[in-house]
Amino acid sequence: VVVLVPGADVVLTGVSLPTRNRGRMAAAVPYLLEDQLAADVEQSHFALGERDASGRLAVAVVDRARMDRWLSQLAEAGLQPDQLIPDLLLLPYEEGAWSLLFEPGGVLLRSAPQAGLGIDAANAAFMLQRTLAESGTKPERLRVWRAEGVPAAVIPEDLGVETSDETLLVPPLMLLAGQAHEARAINLLQGPYSRSERLGRVWRPWRPVAALLAVWLVLQLGMTIFHNRQLDAEQARLRAE
């Protein structure tokens, strides 16, 4: 089960780390990003992505309370997700191009395989200019999709980037779902939210009960063997008489 979550609720960033050990990276990332984040790192969940060509490690950051709320809502609906992915990371990606989707309520931008941001529609032009200015390398092309009924937002002409309007023949969700096989998207279900860890939390309260049950079974087996041996001995005695 693949579940998409709002990209506007997830911060996609990156860090440079010398180690290749995933455990050490997971432990170091929160403190390396502490000064860059407005939120308390103790209240934030960090999911690791891949390294880019420069060796920079992609990281997704989301509020723990928000993660808990998403998973609780899914559990109430009877769903156990295998992947929780920021929606903007399933925008079609093309090397050398950025993808921009205007949908009801906001704008999604994917600027790299594991980078991008969710933008408020009113601030789309400003944020796009700012992101381009902060980017080390400008894209060759800006691919733009617009959902039906969404007003055509003005893209500044002075971006210095070729813009191509893509035809959107399906609802935005279908466009994203078509990329659900995208292996480079960051799965937020890592660390304490990994499937194995979540199952472990479910079973952890029952471990003492399971231990007592195991002891009871061992005792029952021992008593059964003891009684069987007594019966064998009694039968042997009777045959001897």
Q: Model-predicted segments: where are they?
A:
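Hydrophobic/aromatic-enriched cytosolic interaction surfaces used to assemble or bind macromolecules
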Residues: V1-E241
